[in-house]
Amino acid sequence: MWSGANRAAEEFYAGLLQEFDENKKGIRKDPFIYEADIQVQLISKGQPNPLKNILHENETIFIVEKVPLEKEEPSPIEELQSEDTAISDLSTGENVGLLALPIGRARQLIGFYTMAHNPNMTHLKINRPVTALPPLWVRCDGSDPEGISWLGAELISTSSNITGIVLYMVTCKVDKNYSVNLEDLKKSHKKRHHLSTLTASGFARYELFKSTALDDTVAASQTTITLDISWSPVDEILQTPPLSSTATLNIKVESGEPRGPLSQLHRELKFLLVLADGLRTGVTEWPEPLEAKSAVELVQEFLNELSKLNEFGDSTKKDTEIVKHDAAAVDGSIECLLTVRGDLDFAEQLWCKMSSSVISYQDLVKCFSLVIQSLQRGAIQPWLHSGSNSLLSKLIHQSYYGTMDTVSLSGTVPVQMLLEIGLDKLKKDYICFFIGQELASLNHLEYFISPSVDTQEQVHRVQKLHHILEIVVSCMLFIKPQHELLFSLTQSCIKYYEQNPLDEQHIFQLPVRPTAVKDLYQNEKPQKWRVEINSGQKKVKTVWQLSDSPPIDHLNFHRPDFSELTLSGSLEERISFTNMVTCSQVHFK
């Protein structure tokens, strides 16, 4: 019996050590398999961590779970299952639940990990000194009387020796009528660890905004704004965080919210990306037009109006009127946040018309042919902003003097021409907002608007600048922060995107003073509330947490049916999840 346990501990440790060493060398691999039915994967710092909702930590750990069952090919009959059934299977998280181990098996694996690191186990065939491995966490199926969902083990070590181990136990349950007292938690902690002094630290997360779907056919953008608050000491369970707390805004914004004030500007950006992809791949997937009239009709009408104005020598005045009309059409949905530009030049107006109506390469050729012919005849003398290096701008400047280069509207030239004027227009839109709102200067924006890089890189940088705009506007709409906070947020986003690629899943974190955001949380229920009791040793702690969503992803919890709800309550009000983290210390010497 003991020889079998010793051999199992040796094999388990060897597998963990190999996984750990290969990870340090940068070798990426699949989880290693132990005894055919168990897999172990190393979660590095910064990677998605299944324990983040429990321990609020993000360190390197081993996760132990069952090997997932291979999904069999569905039979024709199974493929005909109803949509409701498919959705039900997905929502229950059944696949994740199958990964959990029985509590007896979990304790056995924790035992192997402990044995291998115990310096007194000199009979084990393990190289000495033993390498201290990251903490080990095992998914449990919650079938025991205590409902254990995780077991964990973390080493206690000095600079050169492993002196002991901390064993963790996590339980979780649906608890409509939870009853817990802070003093009882403290007494339990003192009794378990035989310590006289302790501290209680609090954490609360408030959901300030979360986007929702318009209907079943339009998915919501994944935009969330939450507020994390930490403080110490804690006076009572579910205490409202005091104004002396430490607070951080967490902001994740996905561009393109269909109901958002930037939806039109985002559509222009998407059209710009279509053109850029077309240049890069040779294939252009034209979007559906917004206009009833064709692009050629719209451009011809636009040129006719300018031509008539030119005959009366009053093109500047009429241009301004047309600009204001177009600006209202293009930017009307964001005029509460973006200063409506009344200075769109000829090229920018042309972009507005063509980006909403062009549906083919032939449209591009015909539209630019009409423009060039009007310039060659002198029928129009449009004005332009200074600073543009686009091909169309050069032709317009040449037309002022009656001599124009010959341009062959073939190959990629028409796409490049429209892409250039779109880039110029969007850059000016963003500059107008950030400078108008006093959130950035031209120097701050130089990286994003510089024409010194190739066209594809310019498009990529403009896309990043648009995401910054979406982040700032979302905060302006939903949390209405002071200008100082908006300025700090803008600068933080600018700094991040000067050094990183576009990532709409990135969570921007901004420290804030609780006094500046107190109206957002003091009368609200937290999405998550946690108290952590410890005795001066970080690893020796007791944690109690209340949340409105399951903190454990591999267990299925009974949820009330919608029929259980009354007019006076909501689903969120009826469901609470509580979980406890307790630990015990084992000293090897």
Swiss-Prot record:
Keyword Cell division: yes
Keywords annotated in UniProt: Cell cycle, Cell division, Centromere, Chromosome, Kinetochore, Mitosis, Phosphoprotein
Annotated localization: Chromosome, Centromere, Kinetochore
Main localization category: nucleus
A cellular component term, taken from the record's GO annotations: RZZ complex
Domain of life: Eukaryota
Modified residues (Phosphoserine): S88
UniProt keyword Metal-binding present: no
A GO biological-process term: mitotic spindle assembly checkpoint signaling
Physiological role: Essential component of the mitotic checkpoint, which prevents cells from prematurely exiting mitosis. Required for the assembly of the dynein-dynactin and MAD1-MAD2 complexes onto kinetochores. Its function related to the spindle assembly machinery is proposed to depend on its association in the mitotic RZZ complex.
Record's subunit section: Component of the RZZ complex composed of KNTC1/ROD, ZW10 and ZWILCH; in the complex interacts directly with KNTC1/ROD.
Entry's family note: Belongs to the ZWILCH family.
This protein's name: Protein zwilch homolog
Species annotation: Bos taurus
